Amino acid sequence: MALLQIAEPGQSAAPHQHRLAVGIDLGTTNSLVAAVRSGETATLPDELGQHSLPSIVRYTQDSVEVGALAALSSAQDPQNTIVSVKRFMGRSLADIKAGEQSFPYEFAESENGLPLFVTPQGQVNPVQVSAEILRPLIARAEKTLGGELQGVVITVPAYFDDAQRQGTKDAAALLGVKVLRLLNEPTAAAIAYGLDSKQEGVIAIYDLGGGTFDISILRLNRGVFEVLATGGDSALGGDDFDHLLQAHMQQVWQLSDIDSQLSRQLLIESRRVKEALTDAAETEAKVILADGTELTQIVSKAEFDAMIAALVKKTIASCRRTLRDAGVTTDEVLETVMVGGSTRVPLVREQVEAFFGKPPLTSIDPDRVVAIGAAIQADILVGNKPESDLLLLDVIPLSLGIETMGGLVEKVVSRNTTIPVARAQEFTTFKDGQTAMAFHVVQGERELVADCRSLARFTLKGIPPLAAGAAHIRVTFQVDADGLLSVTAMEKSTGVQSSIQVKPSFGLSDTEIATMLKDSMKYAKDDIGRRMLAEQQVEAARVLESLHAALAKDGDLLNADERGQIDATMANVAQVAAGDDADAIKLAIEKLDEQTQDFAARRMDNSIRVAFKGQSIDNI
């Protein structure tokens, strides 16, 4: 999946063929598959021209029905027709039974407490059901694109935990499909609008689907999407709009004690009415009863708005809470992206615009925007993007390191290392009693920080005030499969830590990489000399710092003549260290070390004498 084929400067990487990859929005209500073709990203329709696949699976004695076919039978066979299986992913049977919602399915429990659906074909788990939804989407993609897929990107809610994410991966694995990445749904929506390459700042993703409402507040910083906060309501969605319409129609028609078939018919008509009122001021609702009686009524947009106003208000309240959790205001939100078919409802768009103070982004079909973002990401990950559009790397093109004393670079992860990768090194304090340490993360092949690319800075506080060199700080560099670098510094004795995230590839072109590599070779000899000089200067500063502290504490162990000689030699070290002769600095340090050997021995003897003062030989 090489995105960037690294070659030495002056050499060219071999060209590669277009690789087939797709993005899949595995939704609660509907699922879609999208791909980039001839530079255009679009969802792929089935043979009937339908883009969305209802996320419904029905098990019969002889077959497994998926999508619209399963949906047609859901009223007649609800027990074996599994809808919204995404809600069951990663949840235990105990959690499901403890919830308020009841389900028509017969459940069994697996050995590890997970739910199993009892069907005419035996017991199946949510992962297997999800795989059945993925199966026709994969088949559709391979037929449309004309070949076998090399990978897929599947979207998941930002709040999905590890178990739910792993379940999604396992569903694809059952089909033998390689998952290039699981992508957060709000991030996918932002990518679809190209917000990942635009102005840095805060973005809100308002996602009102069929069964759930999610609001995500993201911050875009140097090409990295950080999820600041998520909120919403897992039991509020467009389905609730449908149920309110259904209740209204039942009341007008004075229908009571209805069976499951009529209930399903009413619900289907409610959805049609809701969709019609998106563009019309009013529409006619119509159902035919089992005895052939035809019932009709006119439903106006004003009536519908009144029915759903309280629910829309609840979503805005969730937005307000989530913004507060994120620590941002509506004025700071640059864009609001609308996701989910229910955001087509005019009242929803009006209320969102009123709350955020600006029109939301709606130019991309809200049902398809997540799948489109996933497809864009899949195209990048599989290696089809030209180098000028570089976003993600499968190897690290330039070394990553940390600045040490003297402006030196300590490389932690070397260039051309395959990602994902994690590397750790230990560092220590320079001064006695040092309680904080500033970290400067850099990128490049040169020996000095001044010649490398600065990536990020952060500070670790709360280091125990120990002698210089006594504290142990473990610095871990971790680069994930997206090329996102996380640097964590931890003081080992206390566990106190600090971290930062940055995308090393952000704003870095292939030309710049080649230039930096050429410079590292061109100036290699000079850089080594400059590094040796800086190292000796740092050592001189360390020795002088340590000796000043020792003299301040135990200077009375020296007579005036001895003190004068040491002071003179220290002054010489300081003077030579200000120059540019590394060998001369080394010799000056060695002379000072030799001259202070006796002083060091006296300090040791004095420390032992003080430690054992007042103790008898038997106590030692």
From Swiss-Prot:
Check the record and name the Gene3D superfamilies matching this protein: 1.20.1270.10, 3.30.420.40, Actin, Chain A, domain 4, Substrate Binding Domain Of DNAk, Chain A, domain 1
Query: Which SUPFAM superfamilies does this UniProt record tie to the protein?
Result: Actin-like ATPase domain (SSF53067), Heat shock protein 70kD (HSP70), C-terminal subdomain (SSF100934), Heat shock protein 70kD (HSP70), peptide-binding domain (SSF100920)
Protein keywords: ATP-binding, Chaperone, Nucleotide-binding
Q: Which InterPro entries match?
A: ATPase_NBD, Heat_shock_70_CS, HSP70_C_sf, HSP70_peptide-bd_sf, Hsp_70_fam, ISC_FeS_clus_asmbl_HscA
Give one GO molecular function term: ATP-dependent protein folding chaperone
Any one GO BP annotation for this protein: iron-sulfur cluster assembly
Q: NCBIfam families from the entry? A: HscA, PRK05183.1
The record's comment on protein family reads: Belongs to the heat shock protein 70 family.
Function (record text)? Chaperone involved in the maturation of iron-sulfur cluster-containing proteins. Has a low intrinsic ATPase activity which is markedly stimulated by HscB.
Q: Tell me what this protein is called.
A: Chaperone protein HscA homolog
From what organism does this protein derive? Shewanella baltica (strain OS185)
